[in-house]
């Protein structure tokens, strides 16, 4: 019998964690992890390329195994957990959504930049038609004022989303900023609210707890912190903390501890740490994809890549605007040269 839950956790190690293993998951690994998560009574397990359905590419990183095989394998071993997928319109297509629904995925999480919810309308609509639980995923949530976030969440709600997430893609939000956003959504949006954190400033756990305090009932976690950058909120730790707080997750804590230690840890190429790189991404509030570009141009111009990333963050440059990195760096180099002449 399913345990009562106050908060519904989605485990993202098999999607966000794909970044940490360079998208090299095998069917055997996915089966092992998904089966253990199912036995621990985790309600949702997200499986896909790190950048969502159809993300396998030279630009985003090639998958070792076709994600459809991974999704099918996860579905086959889960008796109670539902398999979720992430789809970014423009990368994943309506056809991709239909395929995974046919394989048995039960939840679709449709992700857009925080100011671009309008591009999710068709995909949310299709997911609902396919009978999938449907989530709106507003990424880079630190880049929009609270009023804009509310407006965009209401759009996703109007398209049929069952829940809307505040997604801290860059791990840049501070606890009071999470509080303001979740509180506003709870006041103005009629569906469930969720939070997806990244640990680049070591705040994923604190931010998740603040979100729950403000009424979020959907929280993302990643076992052993396996995710992009410094990883996500560590699921087994989150379950323990929520248990101490009297918040019911319905998840077996000891089984989560064991699968983290015995199954996931040996698969990691390196422990998830807050490195200089992930820290600067959280500090600057920019996409991780900017890092290598900034490094290359900084080397050519004799600059510190961190200065470029911080300036890009100030200008609120978003994913897809990688060409701006060169423009901003050249402009900064010119200013520096002028100041030396003076």
Swiss-Prot record:
Domain of life per record: Bacteria
Q: Which reaction does it catalyse?
A: (S)-4-hydroxy-2-oxopentanoate = acetaldehyde + pyruvate
PROSITE patterns listed in its UniProt record: PYR_CT
Give the main EC class.
lyase
Q: Name the residues annotated as site: Transition state stabilizer.
A: 15
Against CDD domains, the record matches this protein to:
DRE_TIM_HOA
Residue intervals of the Pyruvate carboxyltransferase domain: 7-257
UniProt keyword list: Aromatic hydrocarbons catabolism, Lyase, Manganese, Metal-binding, Plasmid
Which InterPro entries is this protein grouped with?
2-IPM_HCS-like (IPR050073), 4OH_2_O-val_aldolase (IPR017629), Aldolase_TIM (IPR013785), DmpG_comm (IPR012425), DRE_TIM_HOA (IPR035685), PYR_CT (IPR000891)
- Which residues are responsible for catalysis? 19 (proton acceptor)
The record's EC number reads 4.1.3.39
Cited Pfam families = DmpG_comm (PF07836), HMGL-like (PF00682)
- Which residues participate in substrate binding? 15-16, 169, 196, 287
Listed under GO biological process in this entry are:
catabolic process; L-leucine biosynthetic process
Detail which positions bind Mn(2+).
Answer: 16, 196, 198
Q: Which GO terms describe its molecular function?
A: 2-isopropylmalate synthase activity; 4-hydroxy-2-oxovalerate aldolase activity; manganese ion binding
Q: Which family does it belong to?
A: Belongs to the 4-hydroxy-2-oxovalerate aldolase family.
Quote the NCBIfam families the UniProt record gives.
4OH_2_O_val_ald (TIGR03217), PRK08195.1 (NF006049)
Under what name is this protein listed?
A: 4-hydroxy-2-oxovalerate aldolase
Q: Which organism is it from?
A: Geobacillus stearothermophilus (Bacillus stearothermophilus)
Upper lineage ranks? Answer: Bacteria, Bacillati, Bacillota, Bacilli, Bacillales
Report which gene this protein is encoded by.
pheE
